[in-house]
């Protein structure tokens, strides 16, 4: 261990015989990430919880009594924050967490193991909520191939699919929040969001790693419904 420029201890992971360099770097980054350590202390399932909390602190889109849909929710960091802020734990708001992967129970959160891309997903979601959603949010990231153009197409395609789902289930005035990357929403998606929402902006919370190209698109004031 050694101290970095901030005075924190820095953990260096030794390379094992079978450990790939990428795995070593990932593990080293996790061990030295203050948000990872803080998430464990605060009882959050992932460091991503701080990203949502920070964005909501600034833009105030999560409100008591709202109905929230968390796409690609596992392991549940965003759902934890949403449940607290809309009062789902007290039965005032609702949070539906959707993922293909299983996810452990979270107080106030209803989990649905389904594919949001399936044709009947919007109908199932509305039935679970007893109506539309006030917020659809997605911290999903597409699987990468290492080929920049291919990966960009996958990223944009995933955000477009999430936006299309949101357009089917959001109440008027609703909010859509989704992970994009440095290029942000592409021109076609940006134009679509501007048609459907009163305001569209790109946000990079401080909890996003500085060496990451990760950003979020935040669209508020849904015009449809």
UniProtKB/Swiss-Prot annotation:
Catalysis: reaction(s): uridine(2552) in 23S rRNA + S-adenosyl-L-methionine = 2'-O-methyluridine(2552) in 23S rRNA + S-adenosyl-L-homocysteine + H(+)
Entry annotated with the keyword Phosphoprotein: no
Class in the EC hierarchy, top level: transferase
Molecular function (Gene Ontology), one example: rRNA (uridine-2'-O-)-methyltransferase activity
Keywords: Cytoplasm, Methyltransferase, rRNA processing, S-adenosyl-L-methionine, Transferase
Active site: 179 (proton acceptor)
Pfam families: FtsJ
Residues that, per the record, bind S-adenosyl-L-methionine: 76, 78, 99, 115, 139
Transmembrane parts of this sequence: none
Gene3D superfamilies xrefs: Vaccinia Virus protein VP39
Domain of life: Bacteria
GO cellular component, one term: cytoplasm
Principal subcellular localisation of the protein: cytoplasm
Keyword S-adenosyl-L-methionine in annotation: yes
The protein's Enzyme Commission number: 2.1.1.166
Location(s), subcellular: Cytoplasm
Similarity section: Belongs to the class I-like SAM-binding methyltransferase superfamily. RNA methyltransferase RlmE family.
Function recorded in the entry: Specifically methylates the uridine in position 2552 of 23S rRNA at the 2'-O position of the ribose in the fully assembled 50S ribosomal subunit.
Name this polypeptide is given: Ribosomal RNA large subunit methyltransferase E
């Amino acid at each position: 261990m050694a101290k970095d420029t901030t005075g924190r201890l820095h953990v260096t992971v030794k390379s094992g015989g079978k450990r790939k360099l990428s795995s070593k770097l990932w593990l080293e980054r996790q061990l030295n990430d203050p948000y990872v350590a803080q998430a464990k202390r605060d009882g959050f399932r992932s460091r991503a919880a701080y990203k949502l909390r920070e964005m909501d602190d600034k833009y105030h889109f999560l409100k008591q009594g709202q109905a929230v849909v968390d796409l690609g929710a596992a392991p549940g960091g965003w759902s934890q924050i949403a449940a607290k802020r809309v009062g789902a734990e007290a039965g005032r708001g609702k949070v539906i967490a959707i993922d293909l992967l299983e996810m452990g129970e979270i107080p106030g959160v209803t989990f649905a193991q389904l594919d949001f891309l399936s044709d009947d997903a919007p109908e199932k979601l509305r039935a679970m909520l007893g109506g539309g959603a006030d917020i659809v949010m997605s911290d999903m990231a597409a699987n990468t191939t290492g080929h920049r153009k291919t990966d960009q197409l996958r990223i944009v395609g995933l955000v477009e699919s999430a936006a299309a789902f949101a357009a089917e289930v959001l109440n008027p005035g609703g909010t859509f929040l989704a992970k994009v990357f440095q290029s942000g929403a592409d021109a076609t998606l940006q134009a679509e969001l501007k048609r459907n929402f009163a305001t569209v902006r790109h946000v990079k919370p401080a909890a996003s790693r500085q060496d990451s190209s990760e950003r979020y698109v935040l669209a508020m004031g849904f015009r449809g419904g």
